[in-house]
Amino acid sequence: MHAKGLTAADLASYGISDVTEIVHNPDYDLLFKEETAPGLQGYERGTVTSLGAVAVDTGIFTGRSPKDKYLVRDDTTRDTVWWSDQGKGKNDNRPLSPEVWQHLKGLVTRQLSNKRLFVVDAYCGANPDSRLKVRFITEVAWQAHFVKNMFIRPEADELAGFEPDFIVMNGAKCTNPQWQAQGLNSENFVAFNLTERIQLIGGTWYGGEMKKGMFSIMNYLLPLKGIASMHCSANVGEQGDVAIFFGLSGTGKTTLSTDPKRRLIGDDEHGWDDDGVFNFEGGCYAKTIKLSADAEPDIYGAITRDALLENVTVRADGSVDFDDGSKTENTRVSYPIYHIKNIVKPVSKAGAAKKVIFLTADAFGVLPPVSRLTADQTQYHFLSGFTAKLAGTERGVTEPTPTFSACFGAAFLTLHPTQYAEVLVRRMQAAGAQAYLVNTGWNGSGKRISIKDTRAIIDAILNGDIDRVETFTLPIFNLAVPIELPGVNPAILDPRDTYANREQWQEKAQDLAQRFITNFDKYTDTPAGAALVHAGPRR
């Protein structure tokens, strides 16, 4: 699929000069040829696996670098962005001066000048009314492949007149030697300018910086229009019933929303407007550590030609060792969404959600595997966004550690969390949606709750069984927990029963409750936040 008309002069208008060749909107066959070319060195080189997918390495950057993320603070953003240096809540929106931005832009444009470049034009957002037209520019073939997988691929007639709303310039090979004098975190950078509508990447090869970069931008633009912007997966049943799954990386969004009984809308990033829920993306980005055909047949089956594996171990015979986490626990695969058979067609969108599921991976072993939330508890747990940071999704995280991430995606929020909560709750109330808290993490046995039990819990939520069974109230957290559910081991529903004695649970629960209370304090400086304190745990 080749759009016409992009010239060196067009790239010169972005500051990229003397381009030797533009490979514009390459098809998958050309990308395969380019990324596996014999002469490629280092991280540019792709390896063909026995599954047909190409595997690449991203070097030391096997996850995002949130401490290297910056937004230009200017008249556009000064009063709207949730800045890291303002208010109680910590976040990754570090302010950047226009002067330092110009320096970083010069570094990237010089890196891309005098080169053979890959340019991919794509959409972010399945709804034509709110989608972004994004132009990605890179000198690395597999990075072009990544964005072709992950974003929505325009039709030929749409490419013909493509005028980008946003430009992403990936200069992975360049770094910033002046970072210390400029007061930055390191020589690497992921920087955004909402006035110029450009993202710059330097120093990191991790493909997810392009994906999550555009998510951060949608998280800025959509809520200001009253559209919910959500870090969630979504699917739809045969009756048109939509469910959305919130959760941080590794909590099960992709796995649990990929269900043979339901059609997938998307696995990670969605909007919710007057027409319903819609995907931002045209692909999936699934974790592959310990992946097996038996446990996750849909994802395993999607790893064929045109899929792109990251940081996996490829054996000499071309087979992939999915159990090997020696490079990172955050091994990944990107693939176009149509590699999953059971998807919403022709456009990844459906109606309003009726079931809202908050996924948490509780490293403490305190929370029940499932509970039904009241309206106030829904807001409380959405703003709390409790989970465990799982090993490998960010640099430097090698052991599970408890964390609170507002809206189950604080790293990608560009506005204050309460703005996302307010928009989501309005959408839920209008649709009559019900929320549930599902723990995909650990219990008192020290083992992770089995995917078999978690899938049975999700089935009970989606088919309504959970709303028809008797519940008990779990103390301290005041959560309504079902006494039994079809297909779920009854011994795990009350987390207290998974400990040698209930006092052990009580002690851990009081510790975790205090962490919730301490974390939520940052929202009590607003009347809306203060009114929700009662919906949280009490020691």
Curated annotation (Swiss-Prot):
<comment type="similarity">
    <text>Belongs to the phosphoenolpyruvate carboxykinase (ATP) family.</text>
</comment>
<comment type="function">
    <text>Involved in the gluconeogenesis. Catalyzes the conversion of oxaloacetate (OAA) to phosphoenolpyruvate (PEP) through direct phosphoryl transfer between the nucleoside triphosphate and OAA.</text>
</comment>
<keyword id="KW-0210">Decarboxylase</keyword>
<feature type="binding site">
    <location>
        <position position="332"/>
    </location>
    <ligand>
        <name>ATP</name>
    </ligand>
</feature>
<keyword id="KW-0963">Cytoplasm</keyword>
<keyword id="KW-0312">Gluconeogenesis</keyword>
<feature type="binding site">
    <location>
        <position position="212"/>
    </location>
    <ligand>
        <name>Mn(2+)</name>
    </ligand>
</feature>
<feature type="binding site">
    <location>
        <position position="212"/>
    </location>
    <ligand>
        <name>ATP</name>
    </ligand>
</feature>
<comment type="pathway">
    <text>Carbohydrate biosynthesis; gluconeogenesis.</text>
</comment>
<dbReference type="GO" id="GO:0006094">
    <property type="term" value="P:gluconeogenesis"/>
</dbReference>
<dbReference type="InterPro" id="IPR001272">
    <property type="entry name" value="PEP_carboxykinase_ATP"/>
</dbReference>
<dbReference type="Pfam" id="PF01293">
    <property type="entry name" value="PEPCK_ATP"/>
</dbReference>
<keyword id="KW-0456">Lyase</keyword>
<feature type="binding site">
    <location>
        <position position="454"/>
    </location>
    <ligand>
        <name>ATP</name>
    </ligand>
</feature>
<feature type="binding site">
    <location>
        <position position="231"/>
    </location>
    <ligand>
        <name>ATP</name>
    </ligand>
</feature>
<dbReference type="GO" id="GO:0005829">
    <property type="term" value="C:cytosol"/>
</dbReference>
<feature type="binding site">
    <location>
        <position position="64"/>
    </location>
    <ligand>
        <name>substrate</name>
    </ligand>
</feature>
<feature type="binding site">
    <location>
        <position position="332"/>
    </location>
    <ligand>
        <name>substrate</name>
    </ligand>
</feature>
<feature type="binding site">
    <location>
        <begin position="247"/>
        <end position="255"/>
    </location>
    <ligand>
        <name>ATP</name>
    </ligand>
</feature>
<dbReference type="GO" id="GO:0046872">
    <property type="term" value="F:metal ion binding"/>
</dbReference>
<dbReference type="GO" id="GO:0005524">
    <property type="term" value="F:ATP binding"/>
</dbReference>
<protein>
    <recommendedName>
        <fullName>Phosphoenolpyruvate carboxykinase (ATP)</fullName>
        <ecNumber>4.1.1.49</ecNumber>
    </recommendedName>
</protein>
<dbReference type="InterPro" id="IPR015994">
    <property type="entry name" value="PEPCK_ATP_CS"/>
</dbReference>
<keyword id="KW-0547">Nucleotide-binding</keyword>
<dbReference type="InterPro" id="IPR013035">
    <property type="entry name" value="PEP_carboxykinase_C"/>
</dbReference>
<feature type="binding site">
    <location>
        <position position="212"/>
    </location>
    <ligand>
        <name>substrate</name>
    </ligand>
</feature>
<dbReference type="InterPro" id="IPR008210">
    <property type="entry name" value="PEP_carboxykinase_N"/>
</dbReference>
<keyword id="KW-0067">ATP-binding</keyword>
<comment type="subunit">
    <text>Monomer.</text>
</comment>
<feature type="binding site">
    <location>
        <position position="296"/>
    </location>
    <ligand>
        <name>ATP</name>
    </ligand>
</feature>
<feature type="binding site">
    <location>
        <position position="206"/>
    </location>
    <ligand>
        <name>substrate</name>
    </ligand>
</feature>
<keyword id="KW-0479">Metal-binding</keyword>
<dbReference type="GO" id="GO:0004612">
    <property type="term" value="F:phosphoenolpyruvate carboxykinase (ATP) activity"/>
</dbReference>
<feature type="binding site">
    <location>
        <position position="231"/>
    </location>
    <ligand>
        <name>Mn(2+)</name>
    </ligand>
</feature>
<feature type="binding site">
    <location>
        <begin position="448"/>
        <end position="449"/>
    </location>
    <ligand>
        <name>ATP</name>
    </ligand>
</feature>
<keyword id="KW-0464">Manganese</keyword>
<feature type="binding site">
    <location>
        <position position="268"/>
    </location>
    <ligand>
        <name>Mn(2+)</name>
    </ligand>
</feature>
